[in-house]
């Protein structure tokens, strides 16, 4: 029975870590005013009838900190890439010179930054809820095992320590992202 409890601890560590990774991935896609190639992760191009990620069809680089340059491996893709970027919810109009596409990222207005801060807070709160749900499920599993009261209390305490550690990490990452957004 104790082995099952230890397996439960390892499993929740993994699940909580995965929840944080998802949050951090989502944070990368939030526009801060600095050019970040990760913002294009959700942009797909219609390439020979199938939706293909932009990053597999072109090289993407940062120029001057506030500009992304997209160089397609095939020049014939430029109109399709431009169309896909315009159709996305990025709110940026690409400029092209026939070889490259350029995306200029203006600094967000104060109003837009406040909206982005709320989005960061929403994502961090969703992650906290996920971590709490993981904790609840783990506590239920531990309580169903036929452990002594002392062992049960020990494992429940370990679960709470892991939860607290993850909550602090979520708060720290959300605060860092908010500081980055409000830096301008």
Swiss-Prot record:
GO biological process: translational termination
A Pfam family per the record: RRF
Major subcellular location class: cytoplasm
Transmembrane residue ranges: none
GO molecular function, one term: ribosomal large subunit binding
Keyword Cytoplasm tagged: yes
GO CC term (a single one): cytoplasm
Subcellular location, record wording: Cytoplasm
Xref: InterPro entries: Ribosome_recyc_fac, Ribosome_recyc_fac_dom, RRF_sf
Top-level taxon in the UniProt lineage: Bacteria
Keywords of this entry: Cytoplasm, Protein biosynthesis
Family classification: Belongs to the RRF family.
Function: Responsible for the release of ribosomes from messenger RNA at the termination of protein biosynthesis. May increase the efficiency of translation by recycling ribosomes from one round of translation to another.
Protein name: Ribosome-recycling factor
Species of provenance: Phytoplasma australiense
